[in-house]
């Protein structure tokens, strides 16, 4: 048969659109033509495939070979199509039966010797192959990752000879059995490591229970970074769908095998990070820090030291849970449902309000420092907390109830109430959801309106305050929001919202 079709997958953002590799052999002068909008790395695959086929002991057909990567309008890059191209040529030349390739998708880069090398973005391709009802042929190094798509038949190969023997029926490979190494997660740091700071720990529990954004303000050395690093351990475990989304992003963005799955990500970019580094971008858009923090925590230390323009691009993803990057050729959408935790000093030197009087910053310097953060950005942060310096104690006694396990139990119970009631965390309630789930008595409503007027809170800040109060009620397993919940929620709002 002079025509063969092999299925593969491209990599576009965190998605894996289907690519059909069509191979046709015709009479004429020997030549190999590759069409279908291939980029440089794909064009170079012609030479890799020829050498791999010959060095594996197979015949490279001395005919006019046309390879079409369909659809033609989808850009293709990388060496992920090498294996599919080689199998297509062998099937079209009759060296393996073409019918054996009908229910399999192939991914893998070929070495000149015929060895099959790993590729990036295998998990999105595995999920797409499972949805299409086909098996997936992958390099052995990617097999564990592909097996995360439960129910998918994964065939792992190390060399082109193995793949050909399998499809020719000489040595049929059994589906790969995952060893489960990827399902081991690293332990989170414990909350008991933080000395004192009871109010800050309370704010962490509230933030975890309702998925609220959090801002710590305080002098250096008070434990702001230490506190933020404890938040992922308080969050509920990822469900299977969330874990697969996180793993798919890591699969696309990382050049190393997946580790620590399922684990909530904790990202801490440096304050010199650019806009594309934070939200994603480039000529070929890549996921940024907010996407890498999907279903996890994005920690911005020294918040005012970030470029103001960089911080402003966070506003839309904080509301929508995704980021759209537009380029001349296409638009790419990346998920970005992250929980923001930020830390900052109260002034440029960091010691404003210290009893020692070390601060020498002028009011103008302090105002200029705080003006680096816009009102709309601060409005989107639900919990604002000042972290004061505690009495120095090098070996404090551990509080028995001050552990991550105890706090995580409270958070899990509150989250369960929210999921049963409205299907999402309180922070993600839309306006109709706020009106339905955050109802107040007439007296409490009037009291809250008066408080918001005195504190000059915006309507958005008032709605976020109601969500925090709803979370406080859930932590106490209370059905209705009470005055004490509103009063505590007000404590976490700055006076100029």
PLM regions: where:
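Peripheral, non-AAA+ core regions of ATP-driven protein-machinery
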Residues: 1-215, 219-226, 326, 462, ...
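Conserved catalytic network of the ASCE P-loop NTPase/AAA+ motor domain
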Residues: 26, 57-60, 97-99, 129-131, ...
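Basic, amphipathic alpha-helical bundle interface domains used for macromolecular binding and assembly
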Residues: 35-46, 61, 68-78, 285, ...
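Residues immediately C-terminal
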Residues: 112, 298-299, 305-306, 392
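Conserved alpha-helical scaffold flanking the Walker A/P-loop in AAA+ ATPase domains
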Residues: 205, 259-265, 270-298, 330-331
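Walker A/P-loop
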Residues: 215-258, 320
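The Walker A (P-loop) glycine that initiates the GxxxxGKT/S ATP-binding motif of P-loop NTPases
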Residues: 218, 280, 302
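Walker B catalytic acidic pair
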Residues: 295, 301-302, 313
